[in-house]
């Protein structure tokens, strides 16, 4: 069915020139690759960026940057982290806080050292000493920092880029020595022989935070029989009493302790076996009259594994087994059963634990209790040493296990061998297995201040709240912190050792002196200068007696000292910091190392609040990896890839919008489909801003500003809605719920503005006389909306916000959107009763639009103006709201007909004939009819009274009056 005016003769004349059409230089396309750098240059030239925060008069806000490692290209994890921080800093700046964001870099450690070595030829490596290695590492780190810094700047991140903190700077190294010194003088630093996580691939000790635990590691597990040589009388007596047929000699000549281990290479280091005093154990006998000892709860499992029929002889508690002796499996000596702890369970194995104090923490602790030797059978390369006997020279990660298994098999001590899948610690850098190895190391004694650290955790706000439980459990259960490393690229432990002796020289005088030297000359002097030049004057006479230590500090001690090297040192910052914000893996990393050092030195946490985020995954929730080909590069998101169709240049703001769109408290996906969706949202916001800017091109706020009660009801509602949205977005920023900002922004731009207010405003803006009140009042509202919209989005869409601000067509007091400050509104703009009426009318409008859309889908009509609407109300509240609008509304703006963009609307008591469509719903009966009258060629409304226009055109009286016809 065709529309009623389809047969009418149309004129070629157009009234377009008489309309107030959109005019703005704010382009529909962002052209981000060119425009964003221009905006960044504008900020830099006008000191808008981080200096703006310094000039604020409010309280200081310190978000302390967790330093990324100065190695490698930037990835989506960097983007998530740095943009989150920047959103917060920009918001706080707009709120008037003194904000000074100091970006940092973690510069020491093995990855950089390995990169330097990889870049050298073999002959260069041979001639390389520690000092020259450090020089090359410094140069490498600076290059990496410069590359990463340029990337961060391109993302729109504000910070003190001219003065970042680097852990390789003299001032930082000096402050770190100060932290170490205070911990030592407080009694929290000691040197001792103790098993530590050791990486044969890196040839250094590792802290817990430097480990990762893949779930799919396979170990060669073995069940071994250890021949019993001596049994306490009370155990023998019990056995013989309960088994009269077995003589005492049988227990000593043909009985065995059964152990299980996943590290066969540690068998030569065995010094004891341990039992749990609370567990019940059984002596059993097999068909060959051999007697075995293992946990009672494992009887069925072991019988099945060994494929043997065992008979239980008698049962004893673990506490009764102490001092049973056995023949060492590889050495000519006897060892004994000792009492262990709750780490011995019956979940797997035999309930009896092979104990090598030099190669396990629990083993070491039991060894200390029983004064067992701490035998270390492995060198720094992972090769078995002379203490392993005939196995010397084999490698624990290669052939040692096989050699020892074959040996045990030959001695008829091997009961069973099988592969065992479990979580196992790997070196996070080399991705190779680690081992436990007893070496002389420096430790921070966490026991000395654990209770203070736990109290400090309680004093901090953790977001999400689960972070508190996570770090609390880690600190409760952690052992002492091994802080020494056997590498050159790091901050040295400032200790001197007596030549040919065990005495060390480390005291307050030494520490203060080294700290002063490092402050002036840097840590390189430790390798460059002789001992006499490093010692204080009082020790010069005995300088020949001492030699420098060669260990450096754990890089987690480096970054964990940043509160002292940065927050305490810089007057623009606060200690404790207001906020630490990093990935959730930092509960075992930077959050924890910073907490431990700060509590040990100052008995307080280094932060007031800790916020964590998840990891960036691909669209399918998989970890990104080159092998999977699913790596998303933030640089390609911004600048585009080689194929601009498949990898378009979205710009930094779309990257930032992604950060604001996700629930970052968990792992977050990113990929091409998500980017397309975000680009659509970005475009909608931009087009909304463009429409607002384009329709205020001739508006002057100095001439046409209005009080709220002078405005039509629709405009009053719009300003009230602006206040609501601003409040909601403020709350989202304050609570760090940026995905709420994303949702509110979308709804405001699409639902409130594009689909409602701006849709209705078209007639007011385009058709009205330029200076007519109905147009100027709308422009007044739009100016308020666009100014405040620019501010509200600026923490996230900083480039778009500035672009909007630069295209506001009238003079503003502020050169930049960031100088505007956070929106403050008149209380008079809030009107709850008005809100309820408008909500009722919007609900009715939605239902009427559905009915009109039904006509359009059937091709009965084209535009909504070709219709008129009859409404038979059922809903009392909607009817009341229509009466309210009729009574209090402005007749030029607040006619519900104009809100519907139809040619006529009326409330009726019965429905007319000749309906195009009738829709019945809970609000009432909605009848859509063809509009009566003729179409005005200028405004397209249908009117009964039409006058002749130019060149056979038709005009309504309103339009004729506007163009003076």
UniProtKB/Swiss-Prot annotation:
Alphabetically sorted, this entry's keywords are: Aminoacyl-tRNA synthetase, ATP-binding, Cytoplasm, Ligase, Metal-binding, Nucleotide-binding, Protein biosynthesis, Zinc
UniProt subcellular location: Cytoplasm
In terms of SUPFAM superfamilies, this protein maps to:
Anticodon-binding domain of a subclass of class I aminoacyl-tRNA synthetases, Nucleotidylyl transferase, ValRS/IleRS/LeuRS editing domain
Q: Name one GO biological process term.
A: isoleucyl-tRNA aminoacylation
Q: Which GO terms describe its cellular component?
A: cytoplasm
Reactions catalysed: tRNA(Ile) + L-isoleucine + ATP = L-isoleucyl-tRNA(Ile) + AMP + diphosphate
Q: Which NCBIfam families would you find in this protein's record?
A: ileS (TIGR00392)
Q: Which family does it belong to?
A: Belongs to the class-I aminoacyl-tRNA synthetase family. IleS type 1 subfamily.
Record's domain comment? IleRS has two distinct active sites: one for aminoacylation and one for editing. The misactivated valine is translocated from the active site to the editing site, which sterically excludes the correctly activated isoleucine. The single editing site contains two valyl binding pockets, one specific for each substrate (Val-AMP or Val-tRNA(Ile)).
Q: What is this protein called?
A: Isoleucine--tRNA ligase
